[in-house]
Amino acid sequence: MVVKKYIVALDQGTTSSRAIVFDHQANIVAVAQREFTQHYPQAGWVEHDPMEIWSSQSSALVEVLTRAGISRHDVAAIGITNQRETTIVWNKHTGKPVCNAIVWQCRRSQAICLDLKAQGVEDLVRQKTGLVLDPYFSASKIKWILDNVEGAREQAEAGDLLFGTVDTWLVWKLTQGEVHVTEPTNASRTMLFNIHTQEWDEELLDLFNIPRAMLPEVKPSCAIYGYTELAGNHIPVAGMAGDQQSALFGQLCIEPGMAKNTYGTGCFLLMNTGDKAVESTHGLLTTIAIGADTKVNYALEGSVFMGGAVIQWLRDELGLITDACDTQYFADKVDDTNGVYLVPAFVGLGAPYWDADARGAIIGLTRGANRNHIIRAALEAIAYQSRDVLDAMSKDSNVPLTQIRVDGGAVANDFLMQFQADITGVTVIRPQVTETTAMGAAFLAGLAVGVWKSTDELKTMLSTEREFTSTMDITTRATLYKGWQKAVSQVSPNGDVG
């Protein structure tokens, strides 16, 4: 019998649906991508059409097999990784969504969260879920749908409606409505899942007034959930994780103290804390991760709102560059920023400050400051913000970081990676394959069906493209970082958080 040697990872993101074929050595064979429509019905509201999510993802799957030049019979399994928190509610008999998906960025359920805060339940929610009471997470979105979509509450009470994050929706569609399932990393972002008991929490369901029957079964992140006939063959759907946890697993940050930073539009930093759910006192979230041999682990998570978006701003709004790749060239033309700090609080500040009212500023301008200094300050700001979160992680976990693994578009910038190493004093490891989010899903699926035997075997497939080690002396590092903290304090009263 010929061994099926390919894994397909479905990477369902906020702006596009992608499918990536990996071979038995975890090399990328082919990629297909389909963008889909963003809907903004009101200020602060963000929606996706669940049927368009499905059509874009299913067509990307069919296309990638053609691009790879492989038969559906060669596919050992399909893994899924997805945008987290985005909420879909549909009728289980017709398969039709009751409304558009409410996207993680959507703030429409703010009033629900404020009402619950006024009831004094914030600490209870935090203790059970590791999350802050915020519209970002799924629970308030589900409640909003049940309270505002005509007939939804009645259908839900009658047991006719199903809820799912995007992973659940994709599996349900792939299996033609046979399987209603999620896994712990996605469940942990709903604000209905007790991360300590690893079960749906009745008290939280009562708090948000959500019927238990709507919720999917929670299975391990590495398991065969069902089979799809979509590509014309009986293919196992066999491994899932939310995008950031999938990237953490794709980087094999499976031991306590290992951390990764994904440099995208924002920056997402996760640190594995092993079997201990560390409660943060420094503005981080506690969430579920995947550890060695796919056991449930915990992680600390911090998000920086403005990462690569700062570079887009330099290009699109200020016109200082014509291409993001130019930033390294201009930053390298000067030895430092000439005392300039750019605090990119365009939509407030994320972890560890959590100040929605902070606004951006360029500080320290003198007559000698020029374009190169401002561009360099923008790149340095991404690294400073990442250090803010890494320092918080070290304080919360009592584990000093010695290295951080990186992925995402901005890691191609050598200046940024070197400055990240310099300002943290931590070794920055850039992998050969930077598609680590999809790779995490592929690893989980491959382990579930026996393509790979263990996480130890996976370690042999990860290769490092380059390591960046600090060349900055301790005094310079301390002086520069103190300047950053002072700059942040000028735009936010929370700036002295460190």
Swiss-Prot record:
Keywords: ATP-binding, Glycerol metabolism, Kinase, Nucleotide-binding, Transferase. It comes from the Bacteria. InterPro entries: ATPase_NBD (IPR043129), Carb_kinase_FGGY (IPR000577), Carb_kinase_FGGY_CS (IPR018483), FGGY_C (IPR018485), FGGY_N (IPR018484), Glycerol_kin (IPR005999). ATP binds at T14, T15, S16, T265, G308, Q312, G409. NCBIfam families: glycerol_kin, PRK00047.1. Key enzyme in the regulation of glycerol uptake and metabolism. Catalyzes the phosphorylation of glycerol to yield sn-glycerol 3-phosphate. PROSITE patterns: FGGY_KINASES_1, FGGY_KINASES_2. One of its GO terms (molecular function) is ATP binding. Belongs to the FGGY kinase family. It catalyses: glycerol + ATP = sn-glycerol 3-phosphate + ADP + H(+). Pfam families: FGGY_C, FGGY_N. One of its GO terms (biological process) is glycerol metabolic process. PANTHER family: GLYCEROL KINASE, SUGAR KINASE. ADP binds at T14, R18, T265, G308, G409, N413. Sn-glycerol 3-phosphate binds at T14, R84, E85, Y136, D243. Its EC number is 2.7.1.30. The keyword Glycoprotein does not apply. It comes from Shewanella frigidimarina (strain NCIMB 400). This is Glycerol kinase. It is an enzyme of class 2 (transferase). GO terms for cellular component: cytosol. Pathway: Polyol metabolism; glycerol degradation via glycerol kinase pathway; sn-glycerol 3-phosphate from glycerol: step 1/1. Inhibited by fructose 1,6-bisphosphate (FBP). Glycerol binds at R84, E85, Y136, D243, Q244. The gene is glpK.
